Amino acid sequence: MVENNYLCWQVTCKSIYMRISLLLFCIFSLFSSLSRGSSIPFSPIVRSYSVSDYNAGIQNWSITQDDRGVMYIGNNKGLLEFDGNSWELHELPSRNIVRSVYIGKDGKIFVGSFEEFGYFERNSLDSLVYHSLKDEAKDFRFHNDEIWTITSAHGEIVFQSFGSLFFYDGHTVKGIRTKTLPLNLFQVGDTVYSQQINGGLFILAKNGLENLIERKLLGNSDVVAGLPYDGGVLFLTQKSGGFVYQNGKIQKWHTECDAELEKYSVNRAVMTKDSCYIIGTLSNGIYAIDKEGRLLWKENTDSRLQNNTVLGLYCDADNNVWAALDEGIAYIQNNSLVYYYEPPYRKIGMVYDVLVKEDEAYIASNQGLYRIRNRVPELVPGLEEQAWFVGEWGKQ
């Protein structure tokens, strides 16, 4: 009886060991394949947050993070604070939408709304208290000014509406009506750029906006984001894809999904620490593209996003990606060692082994051996029965 129990224990331990070994093998095989541009369309794990989680408005507009790792999201109901465990809503006195969020070097959380802007600051009890800056804009008459972007330039915090710019130096606020109509502001390195409505791309200099690139050189489309690219800048347009600007010259940035980006309208973009470009669209979710233009993964409502309209993107200190959506918030674990592949159909069955090569991959399952080329799985003829192992012998 003791011998039988010992044998059962041995079998059980061996079974557990084999399962753990297989799991670890699959995890590291899949992870290593990501860096090689595998033929399998691996995707990161996505965590979705809905209204029932954060108890505020459906729409979310912008995201940032403080040096403690706390996330702040501009929401239809105000400013959301998330410490990784619990959510807290901070309303503006006007209870208006918070469109834009930005954290200054001093830790102040600047926010923009309709004819309102200011900052939240922690008091001695570690609670956030709001300070309005609107009334500091002396002799400025507000007229439907909604603050869509906040950034820093030349030692000042800059608030942007579609017709005005406001500059806060830490003491006073100066508001100016611009001759052109700024669509946005975005910073690359020490330079702040501004796309003009129905116009070209400008630089925000100390003495105002200066024309940089004519609209026709950017596909006659609005630039919605700028990101570092090999010592230059990658400008992403809403309808004409990307353009690389280096040494005063501009050229098209080609990707595997140019047609989709042009069709679904680029709206936001960020770059991860490992130089992956995360691009959010207005109608088809999020694309992850490497510097060479290869599609690494994409997420939309056909996969794990709860909404396809991306209104804000942020790459956090851990290299994970947050998306402010037209409905909810998405947390994409870009920095995880675990990625996964979900076949377009379930005929693959139980997976026992995986072999990943540069241009193809093989999956051994209880339904046979599958080969994946160009992201499409197909059953290998003659191997339609259960397969436990797949490996290489020589070059085969």
Q: How should each PLM-predicted stretch be described?
A:
Residues 1-396:
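Carboxylate-rich, polar loop motifs that coordinate divalent cations or form catalytic acidic clusters
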